[in-house]
Structure formats: C-alpha cells, structure tokens
Amino acid sequence: MEIRAAEISKVIREQIEGFGADAEVSEVGRVISVGDGIARVYGLDKVEAGEMVTFSSGVQGMALNLEADNVGVVIFGSDLEVGEGDTVRRTGQIVDVPVGPELLGRVVDALGNPIDGKGPINAKLRRRSEEMAPGIIPRKSVHEAVQTGIKALDALVPVGRGQRELIIGDRQTGKTAIAIDAFINQKQVNSGSDNTKKLFCIYVAIGQKRSTVAQIVRQLEEMGAMEYSIVVAATASEPAPLQYLVPYSACSMGEYFRDNKQHALIVYDDLSKQAVAYRQMSLLLRRPPGREAYPGDVFYLHSRLLERAAKMSDKMGAGSLTALPIIETQAGDVSAYIPTNVISITDGQIFLETDLFYQGIRPAINVGLSVSRVGSAAQTKAMKKVAGSIKLELAQYREMAAFAQFGSDLDASTQKLLNRGKRLTELLKQPQFHPMPFEEQVVSLFAGTNGYIDGIEVSDVNRYEEAMLSYMRSSHNDLLATIRETGDFSDETKSKLTAALDNFAKIFA
C-alpha cells in the first residue's frame, strides 16, 4: 500500500485544528476532619451553599457552611464511609428529586430513591428540593373544600385547597389518624376521570420508626388509597441531614401537581422532629444556638416550606397544594418555641387533647381552641347552612357545662342546651378509617341541629345515626345524590329531608 505524504499532512492538520483546548476542570477538595455526620473540607473555594458534593467512597453530601478556610458538609449517609484525607468533588448541582405521576403508589427516601422493593422509578422530570414559594400575584384566595370525611373537621374547622392547617397535640392523640382518614376519603373523588377535581396525597414521615411507616403504607394499600398517594420517608435510623431535607423533597413532588393544574395534599409528620434534626446539624456545624438551643433561623426553616403550599390563580392553572403539618407538643404546651412558630405560619390549627381522647371523644378535637382562618370560604353551601349553628351551640354547651357542675337546679332552657350539647358531642365522634361522605355528613348534622336526636338517649345516638343513614341510602338515595352533585341545600331539599327524618323517627325504636 502506497503512503502519500500529502494525505498524512492533511489528516494531521485537521486533527490539530479540531483539537479542543477547553480541558474539563473539576474542583476537588480534601476532608480535614469527619464525625457526627459532618465533614470539614479544605480546597472547595468556589463551592456554592446548598450544592451537592461527592466523596471518593461515592457517598453524597451537601455544603451548608461556607467559612474562610474550610467548608462544612453534611453527609447524606454513614460518616463511617468517609475518612480524613478523602477527596471531595463538586457536582455543580443543587439537590433535586424525581417528580411526576410515576411516583404515585411508591415509597421513596429523601432523595427520591425507591425503598419499597418495586423496582426503579422512571420519572421523566426532576425538580429542585428547595424552590421559591409563589409570590402574591400568582395566588388566589382559598375557596374549594378538601373533604376530609371527618365530621368534626368538615363542619367546624374546614380545610380548603391551598390552605395550611396545623394538626397539633401530644403523642398518641390521633394526629396521624386524622391525616390518613383524609387520604382514604379522597378515594371517591380520585376514582373519577376529571383530573382537575382529583386530590393526590403525599405522606412525609420524618424521624418515625420504620415499623410505623410500614404500618401506614399497609393501611393505605388495604384501603385502596396508595394508588393516588406517595410516601416519602426519612426514618429515625437515617442521618439528620436526610430528616432535615425530606419535607422539601416531598414538597417539590407536590408542587409538580400544583403547577400542572392539579391538586395535592401533603402531610408532614412531624415538623418537630425536622426541627430537632436541623438543631443537631446546626450545633455540629458550630452555628450559634438561640432559644431552646435551636438556631436563629429555625422559623425560616418552616416558613419557607409551608409558604410553598398555595392556591394558584386561574391564569396560573388554578392548581393547589394543601399542607397539613403535624407538631407534637409536650404535656399540651402549645406555647413552646416550635409550636408557636408553626401556629403563626399556618392558616389555623386542629388542637387534639389527651383528656378528650381518654374520655372516648375521638377524634379528640378541642373545638374551642381549634380554628380555621379560611373559615366557611372553604365549605360547600350545604355544609355552611347546616353547620352554621353547631359551633355556637357547642360553645354555649361547654360554657354551661362548666357552670352546671356547681348548681343542681337548672332552668328548662339550660337543661335543654346541656342535653343538646351532649348529643352533638356524641354525634361528632367517629371511628378511625371510617371517613363519611359529604352528603351523609350534611344529613347527620341536620338531624343533630334540628332536634331529631334530642329525645334519644346519649348512648343510642350512634345507633340512631347508623340506622338513619342506612334508611336514607335505601329509601332516599336520590336526596343524597342531589346534595352530593349540587353541593347545595335548597329549601326543596330541606323540606324533603325533614319529611324523610320525620318518617324515620316513627320507625326508629
């Protein structure tokens, strides 16, 4: 084969001209010290706050403290895999997670990796964990109801789509139970084909026991609620940085639905454990402690998370993200640091009491201390008309009950008020995993506020309610359907319902 010098020189010239002079520069630092999930790194001069870094062992971390001579990195994993002198590389990326409908029905960790053994998640989109909350102009007032299926909530402390309603109470008072019941109650609305009415659910477990998370997942699966839910978990055995990060990651998953003309409901269980994880990280990073040893920006920790829950304007697609943060109190002390912070950020609170719980009043909602700052704007017309008087009657009952302990001779009107109050309190009791459809709640509360249960023994109120609803389903299903479809309670519906309840009163014994 003949070799031509001209061809060789041409090839060499082309190679020289096409040679890329831009060498890839990757900034590398070294670990000075490591311990308690924190690594001090030297040499990452251009690293940005919140940037992901990778250690030579493959473990990831996040740069949180940028100091003059070193960088404080929190480790997303075991610090046993990171040693002094190890190399650390910048990734140039902020923490992001997979988002989209592909996550529905799955259990993932704080970084969006599946932990349910059902294979990889092929999400088409990713989104940063920390996103800016929507401004004032893209928002709209809350005006649609989130039907929780819990009578005491839907009637007295209504939650609207886009609202932030705090669930607060001591341990073992049924905080998580309220959230799970709200998830289960979305089954009917999610079985339809209209995506703008559906409400997707996200449960965020922060610092919970693994057995507790497994139990919640099993309950959601048994009730058929897992298919429209995502469970995001950073359990008690996981490092503090992941417990700190998990609410933000889960919120990004919820924001996908909010920004795509859909609706999502997110439960943070619970934010006191996130604050404890953040306090641990801050103290180890040598940040100055404040009240109760929490860092100075612990308010901002929760406010920047909860502000991301919003009802978007029609121009922005009219989607919404509703947040139900949970806070655990110690011995009912709502004036502690974290509870007061979160109460001031949210649009109302559901206050659960141990005493009520042990008296058998479940859900153990203290109606006097619980409030929704959105109020009746988040209720349907039917519920507004029926539940308007119940809150006042219960408030009067509690006031009178306190006085009645001291006096035995009470006049007839006071006696009537006390009797009605006892029966209404009984009517608002509800077993767990039995959320009630909206139209049945309306009928039940109408019977309660219009004297149909006044002549019934307190112990028979629940039996009356079950029998009455069963009668309504079998004989007056059209009436229930009208309330459900119109969401209103017209005079015609009222007269029909009154006649039906009068009829039932004759046959109930």
Curated annotation (Swiss-Prot):
UniProt keyword annotation of Transferase present: no
Main EC class the enzyme belongs to: translocase
Classification via InterPro entries: ATP_synth_asu-like_sf (IPR023366), ATP_synth_asu_C (IPR000793), ATP_synth_asu_C_sf (IPR038376), ATP_synth_F1_a_nt-bd_dom (IPR033732), ATP_synth_F1_asu (IPR005294), ATPase_a/bsu_AS (IPR020003), ATPase_F1/V1/A1_a/bsu_N (IPR004100), ATPase_F1/V1/A1_a/bsu_N_sf (IPR036121)
Keyword Secreted: no
CDD domains to which the protein is assigned, alphabetical: ATP-synt_F1_alpha_C (cd18113), ATP-synt_F1_alpha_N (cd18116), F1-ATPase_alpha_CD (cd01132)
Coiled-coil residues: none
Catalytic activity: ATP + H2O + 4 H(+)(in) = ADP + phosphate + 5 H(+)(out)
Topology of the protein relative to the lipid bilayer: Peripheral membrane protein
GO molecular function, one term: ATP binding
Pfam families (UniProt xref): ATP-synt_ab, ATP-synt_ab_C, ATP-synt_ab_N
Enzyme Commission number(s) from the entry: 7.1.2.2
Keywords: ATP synthesis, ATP-binding, Cell inner membrane, Cell membrane, CF(1), Hydrogen ion transport, Ion transport, Membrane, Nucleotide-binding, Translocase, Transport
The organism's place on the tree of life at top rank: Bacteria
Localization annotation: Cell inner membrane
GO cellular component terms attached to this protein's record: plasma membrane; proton-transporting ATP synthase complex
Positions of the record's site feature: Required for activity: S370
Residue numbers binding ATP: G169, D170, R171, Q172, T173, G174, K175, T176
Assembly and interaction partners: F-type ATPases have 2 components, CF(1) - the catalytic core - and CF(0) - the membrane proton channel. CF(1) has five subunits: alpha(3), beta(3), gamma(1), delta(1), epsilon(1). CF(0) has three main subunits: a(1), b(2) and c(9-12). The alpha and beta chains form an alternating ring which encloses part of the gamma chain. CF(1) is attached to CF(0) by a central stalk formed by the gamma and epsilon chains, while a peripheral stalk is formed by the delta and b chains.
Family indicated by similarity: Belongs to the ATPase alpha/beta chains family.
PANTHER family named among the record's database cross-references: ATP SYNTHASE SUBUNIT ALPHA, MITOCHONDRIAL
Job of this protein: Produces ATP from ADP in the presence of a proton gradient across the membrane. The alpha chain is a regulatory subunit.
Family annotation (HAMAP family): ATP_synth_alpha_bact (MF_01346)
Protein's name according to its UniProt entry: ATP synthase subunit alpha
UniProt source species: Zymomonas mobilis subsp. mobilis (strain ATCC 31821 / ZM4 / CP4)
